Amino acid sequence: GVELDVLVSNAGVAPPRARPTRHGLDEIFQVNYLAKFILANRLLSEGILPNATFAGNGRPAGRTPRIIYISSDSHQGASAIDYEEFGVYYDYGVRKSINMYSYYKLVLNTFATELARRLQSEGQVDVSVNVMCPGPVNSNIARDAPPVLKGFMKLIFSVFFRSPEKAARPVSYLTASSEMEGLTNDYLHMFNRKRMDEKVYLPEEGKKLWAASAAVWRRVDPRAGTYLLSDD
């Protein structure tokens, strides 16, 4: 009987090289994107995030549930989604890892846009889905950096990057502000609204990504069909 009003999805890693998960997938792919796809599917299909679209337990106007994805403006200009290699594990090093971080932020934002589309009908928002970039944050995301760089990066982070408390303020706004009631598919760079990379908004990309994501997880989890939402 548990219901959530808000889901803030923030998990992310920045490993210095490719690392396989126990499912045989790339860690940055599984943590930074696929886990968020699976979690949203499960919470929506089971009505834990109340919605009329998939679970038939939608909230009345003025009480719209909210999903907020923490992303990065580094997605701007990232490579288009490669569906031939989507979900395929292969080895790479530090330089490619930086590109992969930005790439999977583009993937995440494309998914968020498609999810927002599916959760509204004829101008009525069933569940709002918004994305934000907190800017540079003094966090431990570089904890796996090579030892020779870790101390230097820690110094740079502490001097020039925002504290987690300041970085969380736009998240609190998206979570609780009455100004955001019923608004969906917005992107905030800190507190500033802006456009995401234009590739994110292509409807055919969103549909292809949804189908590809579901296919990857069905190969891993034989129970996936019980909670993954329709590919349509």
Question: Over which residues does each language-model region extend?
Answer:
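C-terminal, well-structured subdomains that either form a transmembrane helix-short loop-helix hairpin
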Residues: 128-144, 160-170, 202
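A glycine/serine/threonine-rich, flexible loop-to-helix segment
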Residues: 84-85, 138-155
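Short, hydrophobic alpha-helical segments
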Residues: 47, 175-179, 217, 221
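C-terminal helical subdomain
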Residues: 155-195, 201-205
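Rossmann-fold NAD(P)H-dependent dehydrogenase/reductase core
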Residues: 1-140, 227-228
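Charged catalytic carboxylate motif
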Residues: 107, 166, 208
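Non-transmembrane alpha-helical segments in soluble domains
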Residues: 112, 116, 172, 210, ...
